């Protein structure tokens, strides 16, 4: 690999996007940032396209997050940890008047969604390669219509539970960023983490669990696009829980 190899630039671009977050010690909710070696075009997308779709948390947020997008966007939704981007891309294509922010620190996942954005000409996705906790703190109050957390890292060992994204502090942060009647959707095939999330959200005065019967959490949300991780869980005999919460009026 030569000094001019775009794969060097891709690492530098992602490092720039995440260094500020890491320096403040909030990088504990996610694990590795990079897996297999990027192909040349993937590296070019990280170096060239990602900066066009990213935003800088060092700058003050816009008063309205819709300003991050082209005119015509009427609401903004956030997906935390989008993995390969299957769900986020499907949502963006199905709802062109909604702006979507995708948060993913894993460089290979970022490369995958950038390739889809380029190939499909998607214009209503913005990307953030750092820590979602930092993003929630930066976002204006009541600026999001929905937050999705789909198949997050379950951190199954008890000593690692503090690294799970769902914590009392992040529940409070999500409540601040969501508008009244905004939604939080959680999908997980690990029963322990689903129970953990249900416990944290139902004890919060800011959220109400909307399920009225078992099928409300046993079946996917209407229009839901299964992710690669979801299909893998099904093949291995694990059934996901689909938890839907609504932000109570402040």
From Swiss-Prot:
TM region(s), chain numbering: none
Gene name of the encoded protein: trmB
Record's keyword annotation contains Amino-acid biosynthesis: no
Function, as annotated: Catalyzes the formation of N(7)-methylguanine at position 46 (m7G46) in tRNA.
UniProt cross-references to HAMAP family, sorted A to Z: tRNA_methyltr_TrmB
Record family assignment: Belongs to the class I-like SAM-binding methyltransferase superfamily. TrmB family.
Catalytic class of the enzyme: transferase
Species whose genome carries this gene: Rhodopseudomonas palustris (strain BisA53)
Entry EC number(s): 2.1.1.33
InterPro entries given in the database record: SAM-dependent_MTases_sf (IPR029063), tRNA_(Gua-N-7)_MeTrfase_Trmb (IPR003358), tRNA_methyltr_TrmB_bact (IPR055361)
Residues given in the record as S-adenosyl-L-methionine binding sites: 79, 104, 131, 153
Disordered, as annotated region: 1-30
UniProt-recorded Gene Ontology molecular function terms: tRNA (guanine(46)-N7)-methyltransferase activity
Biased composition (Low complexity): 11-24
Active site, per annotation: 153
Pfam family, one: Methyltransf_4
UniProt binding sites for substrate: 157, 189
A Gene Ontology cellular-component term: tRNA methyltransferase complex
PANTHER family xrefs: 3-DEOXY-D-MANNO-OCTULOSONIC-ACID TRANSFERASE/TRNA GUANINE-N 7 - -METHYLTRANSFERASE, PENTACOTRIPEPTIDE-REPEAT REGION OF PRORP DOMAIN-CONTAINING PROTEIN
Residue stretches of biased makeup (Basic and acidic residues): 1-10
SUPFAM superfamilies, per the entry: S-adenosyl-L-methionine-dependent methyltransferases
Protein name: tRNA (guanine-N(7)-)-methyltransferase
UniProt pathway: tRNA modification; N(7)-methylguanine-tRNA biosynthesis
């Amino acid at each position: 690999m030569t000094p001019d190899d775009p794969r060097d630039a891709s690492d530098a671009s992602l490092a720039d996007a995440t260094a500020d977050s890491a320096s403040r010690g909030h990088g504990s909710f996610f694990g590795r940032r990079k897996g297999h070696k990027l192909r040349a075009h993937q590296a070019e997308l990280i170096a060239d396209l990602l900066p066009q779709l990213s935003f800088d948390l060092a700058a003050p947020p816009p008063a309205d997050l819709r300003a991050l997008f082209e005119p015509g966007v009427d609401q903004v939704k956030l997906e935390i940890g989008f993995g390969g981007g299957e769900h986020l891309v499907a949502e963006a294509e199905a709802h062109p008047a909604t702006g979507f922010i995708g948060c993913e620190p894993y460089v290979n996942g970022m490369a995958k969604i950038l390739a889809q954005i380029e190939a499909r000409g998607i214009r209503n996705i913005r990307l953030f390669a750092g820590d979602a906790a930092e993003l929630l703190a930066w976002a204006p109050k009541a600026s999001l219509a929905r937050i999705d957390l789909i198949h997050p890292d379950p951190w199954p060992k008890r000593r690692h539970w503090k690294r799970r994204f769902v914590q009392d502090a992040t529940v409070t942060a999500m409540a601040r960023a969501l508008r009244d009647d905004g939604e939080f959707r959680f999908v997980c095939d690990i029963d322990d983490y689903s129970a953990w999330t249900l416990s944290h959200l139902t004890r919060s005065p800011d959220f109400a669990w909307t399920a009225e019967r078992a099928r409300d959490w046993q079946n996917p949300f209407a229009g839901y696009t299964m992710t690669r991780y979801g299909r893998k869980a099904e093949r291995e005999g694990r059934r996901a829980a689909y938890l839907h919460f609504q932000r109570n009026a402040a």
